[in-house]
A protein has these predicted regions:
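Conserved mixed alpha/beta catalytic, RNA-binding, or beta-rich assembly cores of soluble enzyme
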Residues: 3, 7-152
Length: 153
């Protein structure tokens, strides 16, 4: 299956996925070139240059059970970020581990894995996201987050 087909399957709910909301913040800079993060924290500083949203309803360890199970196996991870006006998506590999973090979700370009990692070897970090989307997030708008996994066969 192609990456485009995987994105479409996740968007249509035909693959294990979880959908929840977070919120942008005036201090979103999205300048980090190695990772991106969504946090449950209600506030962020400009030093958190990987953080693209706060006030998340979920952290990595709180994702739907079928998503957590799929993250522990081989597959393609799709992260879709949608404000209603602007959207972007990130593709990565499953970490082959079940995340347990109760505070954050992290997508990494590297192969590093910790308790918050939901994707490794991703094609984008915070700095690679659509800048129109980042501008909207800086205004503090609500963000619809979709995390899905297309298992490898």
């Amino acid at each position: 299956m192609s990456v485009e087909e995987c994105v479409e399957r996740v968007a249509r709910g035909e693959a294990p996925r979880d959908v929840f909301t977070a919120r942008g913040h005036p201090n979103v800079t999205a300048r980090n070139q190695k990772s991106l993060e969504i946090t449950k924290d209600p506030y962020l500083t400009k030093r958190g240059d990987c953080i693209v949203a706060c006030c998340s309803e979920k952290a990595a360890g709180e994702l739907a059970g079928d998503v957590l199970g799929a993250l522990a196996r081989g597959g393609v991870v799709v992260l879709i970020l949608d404000t209603g006006n602007r959207w972007d998506y990130v593709i990565g590999e499953t970490p082959m581990a079940t995340p347990t973090s109760k505070w954050r979700i992290v997508v990494r370009k590297s192969g590093y894995i910790d308790d918050s990692t939901v994707a490794i070897h991703a094609d984008k970090a915070a700095s690679d996201l659509d800048r129109g989307l980042v501008a909207e997030l800086r205004r503090g708008v609500p963000l619809r987050v979709t995390i899905g996994v297309c298992p490898t066969v």
